[in-house]
Amino acid sequence: MDLGTIKGELDNNGYSTIKDFTADVRLMFENALTYNADSSPIWKHAKTLLYFHRKHDEHVKVKEDTNSAQPTLLRLQIIQIVKMLHLHLHLHLHLHLHLHLHLHLHLHLHLHLHLHLHLHLHLHLHLQNNQIINNNSNNNNNNNNNNNNNNNNNNNNNNNNNNNNNNNNNSNSTTNSSSSSSSSSSSSSSSSSSTTTTQKKYSDEERRNLMERINELAPDYVQEVLNIIDPNAS
């Protein structure tokens, strides 16, 4: 690379950017330093120009990098801020949703337990009420049965008393019948002794009274009374 080539590129608009031009100038100075002796004036001038060129190039590069870096830094900062905000919002939303879900599940479990306890208490109370009703009904039935048993016992006692009274009456009637029979037999015997041709006859009223008394007696007493009564009496 030499100065004539660089001049031709400048005349023909061969360089599209300044970077291409400075690259050829730097290459020209490096070639001058490479292909010339250190003691030659071309090498000295090329070294001096290359030094200034590099300073200028570094200054321009730094300036361009700074100018181009500012938007990049701003963009990076903005992107970083956005990412941080997004992450923060995401974490916040995530935590909020997590807490919300946790609270929702906690409330749901609490309601579920509350409903479960409510149903358990309701069923327990319902069963307890049914047991109380059944116990009351059983107690009432037992009381009714006891009352019926007491009434039956009282009726049995009354029947026994009536039977005893009937037995006493029957025994008394039997005794009376016996005595009357004996008296009648004695009277009949006396009458027969006095009048041998006549017998004692029962009147209709006596016969009716005897039958009524016989009907009130027990079977044993009836047989005894029938044995006492004269079968030949009309």
Curated annotation (Swiss-Prot):
It comes from the Eukaryota. PROSITE patterns: BROMODOMAIN_2. Pfam families: BET, Bromodomain. Residues 134-194 have a biased composition (Low complexity). Keywords: Bromodomain. Residues 1-60 form the Bromo domain. Gene3D superfamilies: Bromodomain-like. Residues 134-209 are annotated as: Disordered. InterPro entries: Bromodomain, Bromodomain-like_sf, Env_Response_Regulator, NET_dom. This is Bromodomain-containing protein DDB_G0271118. It comes from Dictyostelium discoideum.
